[in-house]
Amino acid sequence: MPELPEVEHVKRGIEPFIKSAKIEKVTFAKNVINGKNNNRETIIKGMELDTFKKLTEGYVIKKVERRSKYIIFYIADHDDDRILVSHLGMAGGFFVVNNLDEISTPNYRKHWQVIFDLDNKQKLVYSDIR
């Protein structure tokens, strides 16, 4: 499980590339969809995947913070402010890339869970190999 310095490192690594970017599209891996369909709370907890998409697509990433071992994404549209909370778990990671081939570690490239397509033509990818 990542310690505080590693979580801060991830936060600092992604923030300059995603701050002020609009989330245009959210894509879930098949295993995330299958997990939800089988009543397992995987990756997106407490809501349906379609609801998550409706509450994030079209929103701008205003700020990224680290609180303890959590990465907090502050997002907003013209009407609402929202907060996304992420924990890296045992082996999770975020990557900002133009395409999945740019993720240099094969296991992370293969085991992506969620892709946020941004209006700056980059992708914020959450990957977890466990």
Report residues per predicted region.
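Acidic, proline/glycine-enriched N-terminal capping motif
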Residues: 1-130
